[in-house]
Amino acid sequence: MNILNKVKVKAKWVIALPLCFFAVLPSSAQKQDDMRQTVEYLASQKLGGRYPGTAGDTLASEFIVDKLRSLKLKPVVKGKKKKAFYHDFTYGKEKQITTHNIIAVVPGKDKHLRNEYIVVGSHYDHLGMGGQGSGSRRPDTLGVHPGADDNASGDAVVLELARHFKKARSQRSIIFMFFGAEEQGLVGSKQFLEWMKQEDNQRKNLPDSMKGIVAMVNLDMVGRMRDSAMSVSGTGTSSRFKAMAEQAAAQTGLHISCVPDGYGPSDQASFVAVDIPVLFLTTGGHMEYHTPDDVPSTLNYDGMQQTLDFSKELITQLASMPETPDYISVPSSQTMKHAKFKVTLGLMPDVMGASRIPGLRADIVVAGKPAHQAGIRSGDIIQEIDGKPVKDMNEYMERLSELQPDTTIPVKVLRGEKMLTFQVHLTPAKK
């Protein structure tokens, strides 16, 4: 090689290296852009809130199926290609509604472990136009409830997980599932598990029975991350889950709050009810929850990227662990949450415990209710109620159970760096 050729080679490297460097950069940005586009479509006015059985529900399911088909994932139903990714079901007593779960599979590459399946899921339905009995926090106001965080955010992350694991195939098989009618009482996840209990020669690429499902990971409301914090429930439902979650968090820079049991108001509860270990990821509640204001512009897309990175690490560990995940029955930490109280403060606390600051954050303080009238605001971190400390949700519920209506009690909160005390006049809780 002569000197001129050496110069040419060096020049090529000088040019090529920056090009290679810049070629890597768009990857994360592209994923965020893809997730943003998914959220913006699913939470658009055009889809009308994605209520089961409506035109918006159909458009949402078609959008997701098109994505899965473009990724060349395996369908689950024999016969017509158009219905290959749909598990249809009908529910309701007074009014029958037909909708579906959307399901696709990435087969595992290990000849033994590929017969064990992990479900990675999110629900794609929402509240439609809201109204009385819909679950809306503004039941007297009819309007599209877009459901950007609940749960277009989860759908966007699960689609990116499907893209990732299609390329980086895992040892175990992964079922990617988008549940219908979750807001109606976890209907889709329950219907899927009932389907898996039955013999059906129209199924394909799924385990022969429910016993082939060894774990479930659920993502619901993962679009409003704060302070790089996330709640992971179900960490006690299998021996290694807590250590795996902590390792994934350390690798991705997340601060996680681990909740041992897998119960709660989302689809993982259907799986833990039939003794399948679960992990439930969420970034928690907010003022826009179940209102027309849950729109795409309120989401933290950098945080969704962090959720995606964390989920990849967690699922990779889960899909490659040599032993089958064991199931451990964990008592529900929700017991006190469903107790009846004589009073209400009129706030929604951070039930996931995602805040790293001591105390219990008031995620939503309802206008006109006792806490709001006293001066407490969303984001305040409760330190004491009636002179007794509040460190977590259980202590909050315990304090609430001790209070009587038509009394006034001090509530101490941390707001920024200031410790404030408000006198709250308690009103009777609705029966």
Each model region followed by its residue ranges:
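C-terminal recognition in membrane/secretory proteostasis and scaffolding
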Residues: 291, 310, 319-431
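Bacterial N-terminal signal peptides that target proteins for export
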Residues: 2-15
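A non-catalytic alpha/beta surface segment that caps or lines the substrate-entry region
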Residues: 40, 50-107
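Sec/Tat signal peptide C-region and signal peptidase I cleavage site
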Residues: 25-29
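Acidic/histidine-rich catalytic neighborhood of metal-dependent amide-processing enzymes
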Residues: 95-100, 128, 139-240, 260-264, ...
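Active-site-adjacent substrate-binding region
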Residues: 222-329
